[in-house]
């Protein structure tokens, strides 16, 4: 079994919570934590064995690196230190991601070294220029989307000539770069943080191809900088396969896909149901979803609304309940009004997909109080060597309150 002990950042990088373990041992620890968490709600034998991540190394399709700078001026571009939470680790390699991602990081760091006037962004005081470097990997092409996020505060704004220099450094390399974006983070008191995005080079989207192992059903997905997509392509297929098994569709179902992102789950499940309605609040993700619906010829059975989930639920609270609700919310979980809507309309089946079992546990407890029962649970690992995992739960309505 693989371990992380041959990583040069072993013991100091905060990216891996179980770096000293072999992979099978880290899975056992995750299972133990999940069983302890859900013990008040379900018997232990209802939780299926965790599905391992394959491959456990080099499988991540997205990674975000942060810029750090000490008061003394020491710079680093990488991850947060596991021993000093406010300090960064200057990453030179990472066994979880594509090797060439590190070449992009190295070139960016060299560009930064040429510009001592550019300070790392410090969120608590909204000071500094350089925020993050994000790299997405396309599949099966193995090409890259690179996103540099900088401060949009006028005092710390990076000039366009400097950004153009960074772009040309990347393009002069032999790396297979599909897209380069410059993103400015606008944060100020009294307004919600937002991002102004500019495509500097290439196509607006990067592609991911997804296939289900059971029947070969496949689709291609266009992803923009802020489109959500599962971080491991092989595990994404297993998540959707599990959702399909839990639903056990007959072909006549209406499926409501809340927090649908780029439409991945709904599009992949559309061949097995009558129609899919997706809801997503991030414009970038909805733009990707619309592209994906058209590219995969799903206009007749999949539609996506650019709307806050709670607003959608309020607008449709008197409509007929969908046969199945898919919930795949952010780590903070559902909004309370969404939960109330789900309880009010009483759909027969809910498939709750979560990257944060703690919020999932609490919201499942609320759903149980409202007449639902947990029928199946399947954890899936897609964050090797960390404490994180994806957990999929099937709930069915048994009581009309």
From Swiss-Prot:
Keywords: 4Fe-4S, Iron, Iron-sulfur, Metal-binding, Methyltransferase, S-adenosyl-L-methionine, Transferase
UniProt entry tagged with the keyword Hydrolase: no
Enzyme class (EC, first level): transferase
Molecular function terms from GO: 4 iron, 4 sulfur cluster binding; metal ion binding; rRNA (uridine-C5-)-methyltransferase activity
EC numbers, comma separated: 2.1.1.-
Active site: 355
Binding site for S-adenosyl-L-methionine: 230, 259, 280, 328
Single Gene Ontology BP annotation: rRNA base methylation
Binding site for [4Fe-4S] cluster: 7, 13, 16, 94
UniProt xrefs under InterPro entries: MeTrfase_TrmA_AS (IPR030390), MeTrfase_TrmA_CS (IPR030391), SAM-dependent_MTases_sf (IPR029063), U5_MeTrfase_fam (IPR010280)
Record flagged with keyword Glycosyltransferase: no
Pfam families named among the record's database cross-references: tRNA_U5-meth_tr (PF05958)
Gene3D superfamilies attached to this UniProt entry: 2.40.50.1070, Vaccinia Virus protein VP39
Family of the protein in this entry: Belongs to the class I-like SAM-binding methyltransferase superfamily. RNA M5U methyltransferase family.
Protein name, as recorded: Uncharacterized RNA methyltransferase CPn_0885/CP_0981/CPj0885/CpB0914
């Amino acid at each position: 079994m693989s371990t992380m002990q041959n990583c040069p950042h072993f013991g100091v990088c905060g990216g891996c919570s179980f770096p000293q373990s072999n992979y099978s041992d880290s899975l056992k620890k995750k299972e133990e934590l999940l069983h302890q968490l859900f013990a008040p709600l379900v018997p232990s034998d209802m939780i299926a064995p965790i599905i391992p991540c394959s491959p456990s190394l080099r499988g991540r399709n997205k990674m975000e690196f942060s810029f750090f700078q000490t008061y003394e001026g020491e710079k680093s571009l990488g991850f947060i230190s596991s021993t000093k939470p406010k300090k960064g680790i200057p990453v030179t390699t990472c066994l979880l991601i594509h090797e060439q991602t590190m070449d992009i990081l190295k070139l960016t760091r060299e560009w930064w070294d040429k510009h001592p006037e550019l300070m790392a962004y410090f969120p608590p005081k909204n000071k500094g220029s350089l925020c993050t470097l994000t790299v997405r990997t396309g599949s099966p092409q193995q090409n890259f989307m690179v996103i540099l996020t900088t401060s949009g505060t006028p005092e710390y704004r990076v000039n366009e000539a400097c950004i153009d220099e960074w772009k040309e450094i990347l393009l002069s390399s032999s790396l297979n770069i599909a897209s380069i974006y410059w993103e400015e983070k606008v944060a100020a008191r009294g307004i919600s943080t937002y991002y102004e995005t500019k495509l500097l080079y290439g196509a607006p989207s990067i592609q991911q191809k997804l296939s289900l192992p059971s029947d070969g059903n496949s689709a291609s997905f266009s992803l923009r900088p802020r489109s959500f997509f599962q971080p491991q392509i092989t595990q994404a297929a297993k998540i959707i396969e599990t959702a399909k098994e839990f639903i056990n569709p007959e072909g006549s179902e209406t499926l409501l896909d809340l927090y649908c992102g780029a439409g991945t789950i709904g599009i992949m499940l559309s061949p097995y149901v009558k129609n899919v309605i997706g809801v997503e609040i991030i414009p970038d993700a909805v733009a990707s979803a619309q592209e994906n619906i058209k590219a995969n010829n799903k206009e007749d059975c999949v539609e996506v609304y650019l709307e806050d989930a709670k607003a959608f639920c309020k607008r449709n609270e008197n409509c007929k309940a969908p046969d199945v609700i898919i919930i795949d919310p952010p780590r903070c979980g559902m909004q309370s009004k969404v939960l109330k809507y789900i309880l009010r309309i009483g759909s027969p089946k809910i498939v709750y997909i979560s990257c944060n079992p703690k919020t999932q546990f609490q919201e499942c407890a609320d759903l149980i109080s409202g007449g639902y029962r947990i029928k199946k649970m399947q954890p899936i690992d897609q964050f090797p060597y960390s404490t994180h995992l994806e957990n999929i739960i099937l709930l069915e309505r048994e009581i009309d309150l």
